Design a protein with these regions (language model features):
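Bacterial N-terminal signal peptides
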Residues: 14-21
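N-terminal extension/subdomain marker
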Residues: 34, 39-180
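Solvent-exposed loop/turn segments at secondary-structure junctions
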Residues: 92-96, 127-131, 190-196, 203-207, ...
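A short, glycine/acidic-enriched catalytic loop
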Residues: 152, 192-224
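Active-site-proximal C-terminal subdomain of hydrolase catalytic domains
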Residues: 227-283
Length: 283
C-alpha cells in the first residue's frame, strides 16, 4: 500500500511539473532545454560555487576590490547620491550567448535618456559563455556604469559564479558603498524558474540562485546596511508568487515580477525615460 501511494505521489509530481516545463522561460529559448538546465543545476551541489568564495567580487569594506573603482575618473559621477541607484544583476546565460538579448537591453538603457546626474544605473554583467556585443569577456564579470556616452566598464573581476549568493551580495554592497543615494532598487535579469527552482542560470558555473540563496544574499547586503530597497524587479519568467514575495518582503517595499513567461528580450527599458532630466525628482 505504501509503495503504491509513493508511486502515485511521484506520478502526480511529474504531472504537475510538466505544464511548468512546457511553458518555457522566455519565448526565444527552447523551453525543454532551459528547464532541463535549471533542474540539473538545482540538483547539483555547490562545489563549484564554493571555489569562488572570497575571490574577485567586492564583498565588504574589510575585503575591498583588488582593483578599486576609479569613480572620480568620470565627470558624470560628480553628483552621485542625489537621488537613486538602480543596480542590475545581469546573468547573461544563453539569452546572451545565443541571442544577444542582454546586449539589446543594455542598448535600450543607454537610449532611454536617463538623467545621470541624479540616477546611477549600475550593471554587474556575467554568466554567459559568450557576449554578442559590448566587448565583454566570458572569462570576466564586469561592472558597467551608465554615463552620458553610454555604459563604461568601471571594474572587472575574474569570472564569478552568479548563482552564488556571495556574488549577488557582493554586488549590492559594492553599490551601497561606492554609489550612495537616497534610494536603491535592484533588477534581477535572466531566466526564472519560480519559487520551486529559483532565479538565474549561470552557464559558466552551471548554477542558479534558489529562494534561500536569494534571501541569504539580501540579508548579507541590504540587511547588513539596515536599509530597504525601494523595489526589486525580476526581468525573468514565473517569479511573481507569494513565496517569492515573502522572501523579498523584509528587503524591499515593492516587487515587480511576472507570474507568466516573458519574451527573450525581456522588459522594454524605455521606462527608464521616466528618469530623464525633463522629469523633476519627487514628482
Amino acid at each position: 500500500m505504501k509503495k503504491r501511494t509513493r508511486k502515485k505521489l511521484r506520478t502526480l509530481w511529474c504531472l504537475l511539473l510538466v505544464p511548468v516545463v512546457l511553458t518555457g522561460c522566455r519565448i526565444r529559448t527552447t523551453p525543454m532545454g532551459v528547464f532541463a538546465q535549471i533542474l540539473e543545476y538545482a540538483g547539483q551541489n555547490n562545489s563549484q560555487a564554493s571555489s569562488s568564495h572570497g575571490h574577485g567580487t567586492y564583498h565588504t569594506e574589510s575585503q575591498p576590490s583588488s582593483t578599486p573603482i576609479p569613480q572620480m575618473d568620470y565627470d558624470s559621477l560628480d553628483a552621485i547620491g542625489e537621488v537613486q541607484t538602480i543596480m542590475v544583476y545581469l546573468v547573461g546565460s544563453d539569452l546572451e550567448s545565443d541571442y544577444g538579448n542582454a546586449s539589446l537591453d543594455l542598448d535600450e538603457m543607454e537610449t532611454a535618456g536617463v538623467d545621470i546626474a541624479h540616477n546611477n544605473i549600475l550593471v554587474y554583467a556575467g554568466g554567459a559563455s559568450e557576449w554578442q556585443d559590448r566587448g565583454l569577456s566570458s572569462d570576466e564579470c564586469t561592472v558597467l556604469l551608465l554615463t552620458d556616452t553610454g555604459f563604461v566598464p568601471v571594474d572587472t573581476y575574474p569570472a564569478e559564479n552568479m548563482g552564488d549568493p556571495l556574488t549577488l551580495s557582493g554586488f549590492l554592497n559594492y553599490g551601497f558603498d561606492f554609489f550612495p543615494a537616497d534610494s536603491y532598487s535592484l533588477i534581477l535579469w535572466d531566466h526564472g524558474g519560480g519559487p520551486v527552482l529559483g532565479y538565474g542560470v549561470d552557464e559558466n558555473f552551471r548554477d542558479l540562485l534558489t529562494l534561500d540563496e536569494l534571501s541569504e544574499a539580501l540579508e548579507d547586503s541590504v540587511g547588513a546596511h539596515m536599509t530597504k530597497l525601494e523595489w526589486i524587479g525580476f526581468d525573468a519568467c514565473l517569479m511573481s508568487s507569494l513565496e517569492v514575495a515573502s522572501v523579498l518582503a523584509p528587503y524591499a517595499n515593492y516587487m515587480i515580477a511576472s507570474q507568466e513567461t516573458e519574451p527573450g528580450w525581456g522588459w522594454n527599458y524605455d521606462f527608464l525615460s521616466e528618469l530623464s532630466d525633463e522629469v523633476i525628482p519627487g514628482d
